[in-house]
Amino acid sequence: FNGFFAAGSAASYGPSELLVKDTNIYNESYTWWTDFIFQAMFAATAATIVSGAVAERVKLPAFMIFAVLLVGIAYPWAGSWHWGGGFLAGMGFVDFAGSTVVHAFGGFAALACVIVLGPRAGKYTANGVRPILGHSMPLAAIGVFLLFFGWFGFNGGSVLAAEPHLVS
């Protein structure tokens, strides 16, 4: 959150938003801080897409530094192409709830990392391809349920209001 707060949040919406963003025009209960937390979750989602691709290929401290740079600098820059009135917005680009901005950015960042890092250690041997099995099915199942239930709030927030007729 610190990288996104320090530089990314304002940069995503262009130079007119460097100090305070007026979100009350949409909904009086939707404050700048509410929008900041919501957009920070989008930025974190882009970083988690990369984390899944580089798992077991990088050390945690190196990934944390990378994630701060990704979330604080690269993601807001790419987000400003659409949300900040950038060239994509000028071309009439439609992106409901940031699905393309978040997932395409995360996917391309993950692809770039995988190209640089190469395959996981031990995946390819002289005898051919060695399968690397999952480590913890209970943890994987917990992750699926957390993602499943968390997505309801995430997608509901995408319409900037918690009203049933908007999120259905």
What are these regions (language model features)?
Residues 1-168:
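Hydrophobic alpha-helical transmembrane bundles of multi-pass membrane proteins
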